[in-house]
A protein has these predicted regions:
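Alpha-helical membrane-protein topology signature
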Residues: 1-203
Length: 203
């Protein structure tokens, strides 16, 4: 059965160096972060080379909201648990992810705004200030959604959310590529990385 709740002590035990399974746990955690970073490296490459990101704009705003919340949650957890190394490490890693998301949001606003929102305008051109307003509005909504569902899911340290974000990554980009009907901004290599990352999430 899926655990209805979990505590910081369980995480600390799993990632304490006295745990005989620490090697396995670190390997899986390391692979999880590696796949996550690779998914964004592909996004960087595609948006720079093809001027089109592989993920829809709402995924960027959602992941920014999720990861910025995680930065705060893990930093607080570290301070409440004798500066346990994993909590500080996770908080720092999520800061890096936030920087990735800022880059993607910047490119969405300055390079992709017509492709993203152009259908809403008669001439297909999206004013820069409108793009900024849409992104900021989405960010506010997503931050609210992430924190509201943390309460609903009884998810004090974001680990249930992490599983959901990996499932979302496995589903949403493929649907987005299919709707766009083009390989521009998509990649077979990225699809393979997403599949492997999703499998790793459930090991």
């Amino acid at each position: 059965t899926y655990p209805a709740n979990y505590q910081a002590s369980q995480i600390i035990h799993a990632f304490s160096f006295s745990n005989p399974h620490i090697g396995f746990n670190l390997t899986i955690a390391g692979l999880t972060f590696l796949f996550g970073y690779l998914e964004y490296m592909y996004s960087f490459a595609l948006v720079i080379k093809e001027r089109s990101a592989p993920y829809p704009i709402w995924m960027h705003t959602f992941y920014f909201a999720h990861d910025s919340t995680g930065v705060v949650v893990f930093a607080i957890a570290a301070m409440q648990n004798h500066n346990f190394w994993l909590f500080w490490g996770a908080s720092g890693a999520l800061v890096v992810w936030n920087l990735f998301e800022v880059f993607n949001l910047y490119k969405a606003i300055y390079l992709e705004r017509d492709a993203i929102w152009g259908s809403m305008y008669k001439d297909g051109h999206v004013p820069l200030k409108d793009a900024w307003l849409r992104v900021i509005t989405q960010l506010c909504v997503m931050i609210g959604v992430v924190n509201l569902f943390r309460v609903f899911m009884n998810d004090p340290y974001m680990f249930k959310w992490f599983i959901f974000t990996n499932i979302l990554m496995a589903i949403a980009p493929g649907m987005y590529w299919e709707r766009r009907q083009t390989q521009v901004g998509a990649s077979r290599g990225l699809a393979i990385v997403i599949i492997l990352g999703t499998i790793n999430s459930f090991i």
